From Swiss-Prot:
GO terms for molecular function: ATP binding; MAP kinase kinase activity; MAP kinase kinase kinase activity; protein kinase activity; protein kinase binding; protein serine kinase activity. The keyword Transport does not apply. InterPro entries: Kinase-like_dom_sf, Plant_MAPKKK, Prot_kinase_dom, Protein_kinase_ATP_BS, Ser/Thr_kinase_AS. Activated through serine, threonine and tyrosine phosphorylation, especially upon abscisic acid (ABA) treatment. Restricted activity by ABI1-mediated dephosphorylation. This is Mitogen-activated protein kinase kinase kinase 20. It catalyses: L-seryl-[protein] + ATP = O-phospho-L-seryl-[protein] + ADP + H(+); L-threonyl-[protein] + ATP = O-phospho-L-threonyl-[protein] + ADP + H(+). The modification Phosphoserine is found at S18, S93, S114. One of its GO terms (biological process) is response to salt stress. Residues 285-342 are annotated as: Required for MKK3 binding.
Length: 342
């Protein structure tokens, strides 16, 4: 498979995303694609993403992978993942251009349904995405969206959960479910919680959790994992939307609705005759160029995805969280933005 690298359109901690065009007679894939490239430091994450995408197969709501390749650039071996190109970038990039405004509820309903169909496919194949957020939902010219960035995705057990033996924080704090913080439990239910956070953000233009500038991200994890506090549901959202989110924001993952169940909820099944993709597309000016996810982490105002490992195990969430906020961990307050650490 031969291709020619184009301009750089985004950066991750260990990876760079570029456009690319195919050479003549180089296989059956689009003329314009996206290439995620990394050196040896990010090879494991890229390899995991390729393996997961291969296992998932084709799904209209999941970004397509056309293969992988290795190149030598400036004397260094690069690992490349050839992906479907999303011309409008991520929903996070798009909403940033709206200046804090949310999307129309009809658009939120449609995007939510698309992500749910993607999650249903992911979960049915025995995987959890582990990092659902607006930055990992890509937008196309026709207004459709697809789930992307499977670098943190993992295969789960038969009950659709996976338990890590080490003390690990995995994903993006603002989207983490209580069981991820308390029990190292990652699975389909955690993806549903994260989707609820994404729905709040799409509708309101604000994150589901309010955090003060300069606060330690571990203080947010304590709010998520300890006590009864839940993400705030927007007051202006319809009753169907509020009820939908109440099914996502259930502390007990066993009682949280599944993607399959939520696809039958009236919030996404309601028939809106005037809801056409064209109505959404015209809101984006042709000259507006948005970055494809993953974009430069220094452009995020919120904490980005990462993994943080420790060794001991603890008997209670309070003990575990206490260890995580100890003095051994630097105070990475929100003075800037967060890097993806995988």
């Amino acid at each position: 498979m031969e291709w020619v690298r184009g301009e750089t359109i985004g950066f991750g901690t260990f990876s760079t995303v570029s456009t690319a065009t195919k050479s003549r007679n180089s296989g059956d894939f689009p003329a314009l694609i996206a290439v995620k490239s990394t050196d040896a430091y990010g090879a494991a994450s890229l390899s995991n993403e390729k393996s997961v995408l291969d296992s998932l197969g084709d799904c209209p709501e999941i970004i397509r992978c056309y293969g992988e390749d290795s190149t030598v650039e400036n004397g260094e071996e690069m690992h490349n993942l050839l992906l479907e190109y999303a011309s409008r970038g991520s929903l996070a990039s798009y909403m940033k251009k709206l200046g804090g405004e949310g999307l129309p509820e009809s658009t939120v309903r449609r995007h939510t349904g698309s992500v749910l169909r993607g999650l249903r496919h992911i979960h049915a194949k025995g995987f959890a995405h582990c990092d659902i957020k607006l930055a990992n939902i890509l937008l196309f010219n026709d207004g459709s969206v697809k789930i992307a960035d499977f670098g943190l995705a993992m295969r789960v057990d038969g009950d659709l959960t996976a338990l890590r033996k080490s003390v690990e924080i995995r994903g993006t704090p603002l989207y983490m479910a209580p069981e991820c913080v308390n029990d190292n439990e990652y699975g389909s239910a955690a993806d549903v919680w994260a989707l609820g956070c994404a729905v709040v953000e799409m509708f309101s233009g604000k994150t589901a959790w309010s955090v003060k500038e300069g606060s330690h991200f571990m203080s947010l994890l304590i709010r998520i994992g300890v006590g009864d506090e839940l993400p705030k549901i927007p007051e202006m959202l319809s009753e169907e939307g509020k009820d939908f989110l109440s099914k996502c924001f259930v502390k007990d993952p066993a009682k949280r609705w599944t993607a399959e169940m939520l696809l039958n909820h009236s919030f996404v099944t309601i028939d809106l005759e005037d809801d056409h993709r064209e109505n959404f597309v015209v809101k984006v000016k042709d000259e507006d160029k948005v970055l494809m996810s993953p974009k430069c982490p220094f452009e995020f105002d919120d904490w980005d995805s990462f993994t943080l490992d420790s060794n001991p195990s603890f008997d209670s969430p309070v003990e575990r969280l206490g260890s995580l906020v100890s003095g051994s961990i630097p105070d990475w307050s929100v003075g800037g933005s967060w890097l993806t650490v995988r």
